[in-house]
Design a protein with these regions (language model features):
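Residues immediately C-terminal
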Residues: 115-118, 187
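Conserved lysine of the Walker
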Residues: 6
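P-loop (Walker A) phosphate-binding loop of NTP-binding proteins
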Residues: 1-2, 29
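Cytosolic-facing regulatory segments adjacent to core modules
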Residues: 16-104, 172, 217-218
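C-terminal regions of RecA-like/P-loop NTPase motor modules
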Residues: 3, 88-105, 122-124, 139-147, ...
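Structural recognition of the conserved hydrophobic beta-strand(s) that form the central parallel beta-sheet
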Residues: 109-110, 149-156
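Flexible beta-alpha connector loops of hexameric P-loop NTPases
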Residues: 49-56, 78-84, 118-134, 161-170
């Protein structure tokens, strides 16, 4: 739903990918590119959003130098006006970046799908929302296949999904054609209780790559001031089960996996 943290989630994932030495292209149609860059800066520099502008130059320089030793990944943020850019524009952008900057992204973030345009249909021209949003989803998936790169985007929920504590694929706003096209979908679920703990629930809705019943629901921590996601203690996952929000079969699988890889750090 609106305000749950779609952009924060995507900027946090983008920051994590950058730290792995990968190239990231972030296309925004909702927020100014400076605001997106600001969120990624806060995450990477480990500084609160409100403190970024007043960060002393020496401290900034130290953090930047330290960051440069950690990663060789490059970030490009590109802003388009809302509902005016489609896959044709994105293809031209990829070609231009490859030609002029020798930049090939390892992942593309698009913020967000519902406010893209379709390259095949004109909005409002005797085309209903189901067909229009499905067309955008198909075009973005085609872009991912053609360029062999993952495309990560977001959508909204319906009014019913906005107040629901257990979102399903049927709660996707505007078009069920979107989940029919996507390869992997998950929902971000928030509540007053989770917000008080600085946490958010993630629920797998669709997964063509693995069994979606494995770790169907799990909890992650949220630091909104630094636009950062982090792992929470195992107790939070157990509390999720005790509250009836998860399957016992999923939990046993999750606990078993956690035990096998308990010494690993991400």
């Amino acid at each position: 739903g609106t305000g749950v943290g779609k952009t924060m989630f995507m900027t946090s994932i983008a920051s994590s990918v950058l730290l792995q030495g990968k190239n990231v292209l972030y296309i925004t149609m909702e927020m100014a590119e400076e605001r997106i860059a600001e969120r990624i800066d806060a995450n990477l520099l480990n500084v609160g959003m409100s403190d970024l502008e007043e960060l002393p130059y020496k401290m900034y320089e130290t953090k930047i130098n330290k960051l440069q030793t950690k990663t060789t990944g490059q970030l490009i943020v590109k802003e388009y006006p809302t509902a005016s850019a489609h896959v044709g524009h994105f293809k031209n952008l990829l070609s231009e970046l490859a030609l002029k900057k020798s930049f090939k992204p390892d992942i593309v973030f698009i913020d967000y799908l519902n406010i893209c345009a379709s390259s095949r249909f004109k909005a409002g021209a005797n085309v209903n929302s189901y067909t229009y949003i499905k067309a955008i989803a198909e075009e973005l998936r085609g872009l991912a296949v053609e360029h062999d790169i993952p495309v990560f985007s977001a959508t909204q929920t319906t009014r019913g999904g906005f107040v629901s504590s257990d979102i399903g694929l049927e709660d996707t706003s505007e078009s069920f054609g979107l989940p029919a096209t996507a390869d992997f979908m998950f929902a971000l679920i928030s509540s007053e209780e989770l917000e008080a703990k600085n946490q958010i629930m993630v629920k797998q809705l669709k997964n063509r790559y693995n069994d979606p019943t494995i770790n169907r629901k799990f909890i992650i921590g949220v630091d909104r001031s630094k636009m950062r996601l982090y792992d929470v203690e195992q107790k939070a996952q157990e509390d999720l089960v005790e509250s009836g929000q998860s399957d016992t079969s999923m939990t046993s699988k999750f606990t078993k996996k956690l035990g096998e890889f308990s010494d690993f750090k991400i």
